Amino acid sequence: MESANDTILRQINRGHDFAVAEQTIRATAEHGITIGAHLIFALPGESRESMLEGAIRLCELPIQVLKLHQLQIVKGTRLAEQYLENPALFHLYTLDEYLDFVVEVIERIRSDVYLERFVNQSPSEYLIAPQWGIKNFEFTAKLDKRLEELDTWQGRLKS
């Protein structure tokens, strides 16, 4: 998926819109197949509200697994060219900003969706930004601590 926003999906050349993904997910679910989805947060042009709404919409579908990760700018890609030409088009989260956003997402999605991953880390020699230097298990520990500090949990604000 990468995003539930059709404009963003066109920009990143996904070759489908949300309606096609939704139809495919529903058709696959009818056959009893476990379905996983994937979202990248902070794609250029996507607002915080759009990303949050997209995660909620996606989790209203019959998915069982969700992978999340931050946008990474990797050397040698079209995205890297765009970033180097005009970094103002990008809002790359700091680690704490991303942690807070993931908490917002978790609070609003179904509690039965298995969250498989929260961050991705490209090898440092290929990564332009963001340079967090953190592995998924380290982020997960920080996330667990933040959830505990806030006395919140997955699905707490699901309407």
What are these regions, as identified by a protein language model?
Residues 65, 72-159:
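Auxiliary Fe-S-binding modules of radical SAM enzymes
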Residues 35-38, 67:
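Short hydrophobic alpha-helical runs that function as membrane-insertion/retention elements
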Residues 1-32, 41-61, 79-96:
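Conserved non-cysteine loop/helix-boundary elements of the Radical SAM core domain that shape
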Residues 23-35, 61, 100-114:
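A structural motif corresponding to the C-terminal end of an alpha-helix
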